[in-house]
UniProtKB/Swiss-Prot annotation:
Location(s), subcellular: Cytoplasm
Record's keyword terms, sorted: Cytoplasm, Heme biosynthesis, Iron, Lyase, Metal-binding, Porphyrin biosynthesis
Protein function: Catalyzes the ferrous insertion into protoporphyrin IX.
One Pfam family matching this protein: Ferrochelatase
Main subcellular localisation: cytoplasm
Protein name per the record: Ferrochelatase
This enzyme's EC code(s): 4.98.1.1
Pathways per UniProt: Porphyrin-containing compound metabolism; protoheme biosynthesis; protoheme from protoporphyrin-IX: step 1/1
Length: 371
């Protein structure tokens, strides 16, 4: 095996500490070609689909991708941002805004840290962002997946890709991983403030009359729970802590799971049938919030805000509210900073003074270094 050459070393260059925010990914454009390319990478990951490759890949390439690429492209088209200050995939736009906001906040607090965002599938890739950090002289990297609840299908595959990339480097940085933050007080407080701010603007559900808050998390196959994945338990804990923070009784909110794919049983109860059932019984108002998604994306903006509303209203429901994800709201950015800072304890968080860097460079040149 050959290892990639390192960038030319600059004596006196300040070593950097970076925070790498990692999210799932998104196609480059809302077109069948771009969506097909993205889905191919995503659904080819054995962490995502645990089916023997010989059985799965022919089905993926021959049936699923040709059918799903066009249909999914239409869904992406329906949520694609085209505003002057926000253009592109919502997940990428909000992820970049989160990184920039976190960078600003940490700088304001006196920390000289680099914040970058990458996608597990699609662009900007983990490999390309790590390479950019390497060329900046980064020597410590905190990998912070934007998955509050750990799952082998999400968090673990992000870690896998980081290790795969670094396995090709000759000079590797120090690495720390944030496994989860599903019960972190700052995360729960940020969720609480997001829901509270929405209710302050749009009115609070009348829980005494049967209105309900649905907390919808991304689903995974039930088999993963049986094999020891903690995701289900962590979602339930997040839901309980948020319900307690909001002062709700157990019957006033419900944890559900969305985005089921294929015919196998996934974690239940499923979100769409739950919304339809609430519509059938004549629920006056249903609010849906997705605590496991720190940034709005196709699963929230299209699957919940559009399809979910249709499920509920067609079945007989009266009023549907989709509560947006936290995106770059200040309480969430503050929580993200608190989580990150707890995990970089002991690392250099500020640049050495310029005169110290110059002294290092001079000493190296005295000993024969070229630069």
């Amino acid at each position: 095996m050959t290892f990639s050459p390192e960038p030319a070393y600059q004596h006196g260059q300040a070593p950097r500490t970076a925070i790498l925010l990692v999210n799932l990914g998104t196609p480059d454009a809302p077109t069948p070609k771009a969506v097909g390319r993205y889905l191919k990478e995503f659904l080819s990951d054995p962490r995502v689909v645990e089916i023997p490759r010989l059985a799965w890949l022919p089905l993926l390439y021959g049936v699923i991708l040709p059918l799903r690429a066009r249909a999914s492209a239409l869904k992406y088209e329906s949520i694609w941002l085209r505003e002057a200050h926000m253009t592109g995939s919502p997940l990428l736009v909000y992820s970049e805004r989160q990184a920039h906001a976190l960078q600003r906040l940490l700088n304001q607090q006196g920390y000289e840290l680099t914040v970058a965002c990458a996608m597990r599938y699609g662009n900007p890739s983990i490999a390309s962002v790590l390479e950019a950090l390497r060329r900046q002289g980064t020597e410590q990297v905190l990998v912070l997946p934007m998955y509050p609840q750990y799952s082998g299908t999400t968090t673990a595959t992000a870690f896998d890709e980081v290790f795969r990339v670094l396995g090709q480097w000759r000079n590797q940085p120090e690495i720390r991983l944030v496994k989860h933050f599903h019960d972190h007080p700052a995360y729960i407080a940020a969720l609480h403030q997001q829901v509270g701010a929405y209710w302050a603007q749009h009115g609070t559900p009348d829980f005494a009359r049967g209105d309900k808050l649905i907390l919808s998390f991304h689903g995974v196959p039930r088999r993963t729970l049986e094999l020891g994945d903690p995701y289900h338990c962590e979602c339930l804990k997040t839901g309980r802590l948020l319900g307690d923070a909001l002062g709700l009784q157990p019957g006033q909110y419900q944890v559900t799971f969305q985005s089921r794919f294929g015919k196998a049983e996934w974690l239940q109860p499923y979100t769409a049938p739950t919304l339809a059932e609430l519509g059938k019984v004549g629920a006056g108002r249903v609010d849906v919030f997705c605590p496991g998604f720190p940034a709005d994306c196709i699963e929230t903006l299209e699957e919940i805000a559009m399809e979910g509303q249709t499920e509920f209203m067609v079945a007989g429901g009266k009023t549907f509210h989709f509560i947006p994800c936290m995106n770059d709201a200040q309480p969430w950015i503050s929580a993200l900073a608190e989580i990150a800072l707890q995990h970089v304890q002991g690392w250099p968080l500020n640049m050495p003074h310029a005169h110290e860097l110059e002294a290092r460079r001079s000493r190296a040149q005295t000993r024969g270094a070229a630069a």
